[in-house]
Amino acid sequence: RGLIDLGIDRVISGPGAVEPPAIVAAIDEIPPGSVVVSLDAKGGEVVVSGWTEGTGLDPAAAAARYEELGAGAVLFTNVDVEGQLAGIDRNAVESVVGAVDIPVIASGGVATVEDVVALKRTGAVAVVVGTALYEGAFTLRAAQAAADEA
């Protein structure tokens, strides 16, 4: 709540908040839509504790539940491909995007500008790119230009 009072628009609730009581508490304390729920998925299930502990939750179903509870957006990270320049799992992102009406930010596996475009076409409103930029696989300007044209 303190960050919102300072003028911060959104607060990301980390993957530890996969239990509904934790997210409900966070959502109840700040303005509607201000919580971005971070969902990390591995092997098709939401994971916590540094991606080591499965929860049994389907990412799309979890995203839909958090939307019902008042989350304003979802940051979806596919940790199967995170940081590996291995390419994206478009189907996983499409599943989460299709399950909710709130914005979805996609993360994990981006290796090429084409991956950025593909994620935009899933309906994701934003894409997190880390390793590809760090390793010089492409420039931010090139990714933005390609996404704008898509």
Task: Label the predicted regions.
Residues 53, 83-84, 106, 134:
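Residue-level marker of alpha-helix boundaries and capping positions
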Residues 83-85, 113-116, 135-138:
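Short active-site-adjacent structural elements
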Residues 19-41, 85-112, 147-149:
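Alpha-helix-loop-beta-strand connector modules within alpha/beta enzyme cores
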Residues 132-150:
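Short, basic/aromatic-enriched C-terminal tail that caps enzymatic domains
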